[in-house]
């Protein structure tokens, strides 16, 4: 190992905790913000240029988009894990085969998604609760996204390999370029060309095409040690099997998230039609879907940077835990808790007391939707300030190699607690119960995470 690499590793056990946390968290925060922008920018410009019907259409497509992301994650993370191991073993031919097989799998996955999507898209959207008003809008948006599915899989999937080859800034730069392109193209296609909901879809696909082209260009450059090569793109079953097996655990949560969003969309439509009055523009169910689309965009923009901050602490916790520097492990946890809580308390206060101001830009011409979204945000975000308890605890278990406990804690908030409450509460509280399921799951996951963390910390002396 080089002296420089040794010094970098040793700094985990000697450098200032705040400095280390910020050093590793800032790139992760930027990466997460980039991902959040893809979600929030489309809905912002659609709200401005298309209206509430457009927001409802995009929101109905979200479970399918999450499924595509899960497939990309399965191949990208699974392939990259195996790729990194072979790099460490200096088995560069095998590493090249793994990289190229992953590239082929991402393309095949996208083609399969496009074909299946064309067949099942309309039945799925109806199952999620699409009405006669929202189905044409959602179908128009989703059909274009399916057409460009290959770019949605290649861009995030292959970016993992760039990081493993020692170019994290290059990977981040390509993500940022994609996000900035999306903002510019959304404004151009929706606000200037007036392409409506199709403009939002074409902006997303075009920006991902740009990101995919930049990422592919990295792998064909002369100075890239492991390139995309035709002769290594032929699928080898032993590698394909390992890639998929390694990729299933990280993609499983995303698949569960897709399922949860499908149940949520159905619940919003069903109980929105009961609890909300038809406005003439939107039915009660469509209004509930649009309101959730706005709330979810704002919540994602708040949560994803927090996730980046928390995930940035994992290598620091892992190194010091392995080195038995338990005082530094506890110091890292304390620092992370303080800043995560501080950030979330400010965000929670804004959600509670400035809800109207936060939702207004998404529906400038629909006061009823603004009112509904602000009401929903105050319920949905009621326990947001408690989220750091579960997130930091989960990150601790991930960093110390206890992946199953980490998966359990992440699953508590998104699946294990949320889905049962989502299915039960609306029977008693109608639409309010749909939005109340999330804060109850947030609080439950926080208490479970804290209990598990305190139990584990007692073992650290």
Please annotate each region the language model reported.
Residues 29-81, 145-152, 241-319, 340-348, ...:
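Transmembrane helix-bundle signature of multi-pass secondary active exporters and lipid flippases
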Residues 1-25, 83-150, 192-248, 317-383, ...:
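Short alpha-helical transmembrane segments in multi-pass integral membrane proteins
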Residues 35, 39, 43, 47, ...:
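Juxtamembrane/transmembrane-helix interface segments of polytopic membrane transporters
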Residues 48-51, 85, 164, 193, ...:
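Membrane-helix boundary and inter-helical linker elements of multi-pass secondary transporters
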Residues 76, 145-163, 171-179, 200-215, ...:
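Short runs within selected transmembrane alpha-helices of multi-pass transporters and secretion channels
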Residues 26, 42, 79-80, 120-121, ...:
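Hydrophobic/aromatic residues in alpha-helical transmembrane segments
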Residues 55-115, 152-171, 289-349, 353-355, ...:
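Small-residue-rich hydrophobic transmembrane alpha-helices
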Residues 67, 182-186, 212-216, 301-304, ...:
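Hydrophobic transmembrane alpha-helices of multi-pass small-molecule transporters
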């Amino acid at each position: 190992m080089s002296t420089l690499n040794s010094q970098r590793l040793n700094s985990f056990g000697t450098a200032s905790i705040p400095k280390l946390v910020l050093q590793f968290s800032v790139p992760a925060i930027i990466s997460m913000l980039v991902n959040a922008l893809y979600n929030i920018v489309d809905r912002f410009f659609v709200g401005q240029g298309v209206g509430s019907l457009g927001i409802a259409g995009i929101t109905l497509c979200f479970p399918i988009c999450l499924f595509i992301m899960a497939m990309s994650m399965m191949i990208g993370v699974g392939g990259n894990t195996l790729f990194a191991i072979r790099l460490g073993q200096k088995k560069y031919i095998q590493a090249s085969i793994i990289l190229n097989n992953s590239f082929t799998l991402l393309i095949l996955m996208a083609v399969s998604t496009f074909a299946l999507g064309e067949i099942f898209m309309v039945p799925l959207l109806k199952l999620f609760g699409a009405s006669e008003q929202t189905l044409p809008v959602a179908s128009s948006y989703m059909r274009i996204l399916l057409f460009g599915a290959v770019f949605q899989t290649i861009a995030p999937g292959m970016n993992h390999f760039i990081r493993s080859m020692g170019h994290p800034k290059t990977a981040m730069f390509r993500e940022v370029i994609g996000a900035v392109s999306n903002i510019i193209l959304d404004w151009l296609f929706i606000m200037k060309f007036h392409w409506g909901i199709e403009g939002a879809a074409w902006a997303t696909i075009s920006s991902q095409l740009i990101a995919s082209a930049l990422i592919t260009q990295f792998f064909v450059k002369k100075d890239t040690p492991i390139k995309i090569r035709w002769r290594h793109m032929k699928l080898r079953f032993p590698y394909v099997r390992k890639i998929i097996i390694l990729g299933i655990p990280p993609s499983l949560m995303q698949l569960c998230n897709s399922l949860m969003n499908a149940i949520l969309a159905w619940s919003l439509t069903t109980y929105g039609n009961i609890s909300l009055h038809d406005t003439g523009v939107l039915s009660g169910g469509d209004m509930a879907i649009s309101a959730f689309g706005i709330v979810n965009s704002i919540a994602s923009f708040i949560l994803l940077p927090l996730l980046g901050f928390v995930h940035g602490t994992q290598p620091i916790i892992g190194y010091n835990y392995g080195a038995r520097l338990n005082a530094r492990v506890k110091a890292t946890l304390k620092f992370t808790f303080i800043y995560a809580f501080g950030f979330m308390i400010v965000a929670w206060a804004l959600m509670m007391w400035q809800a109207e101001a936060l939702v207004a830009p998404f529906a400038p011409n629909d006061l009823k939707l603004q009112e509904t979204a602000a009401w929903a945000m105050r319920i949905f975000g009621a326990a947001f300030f408690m989220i750091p308890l579960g997130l930091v605890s989960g990150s601790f278990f991930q960093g110390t190699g206890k992946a199953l406990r980490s998966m359990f804690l992440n699953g508590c908030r998104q699946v294990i607690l949320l889905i049962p409450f989502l299915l039960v509460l609306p029977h008693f509280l109608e639409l309010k119960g749909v939005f109340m399921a999330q804060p109850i799951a947030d609080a439950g996951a926080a208490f479970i995470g804290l209990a598990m963390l305190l139990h584990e910390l007692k073992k650290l002396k």
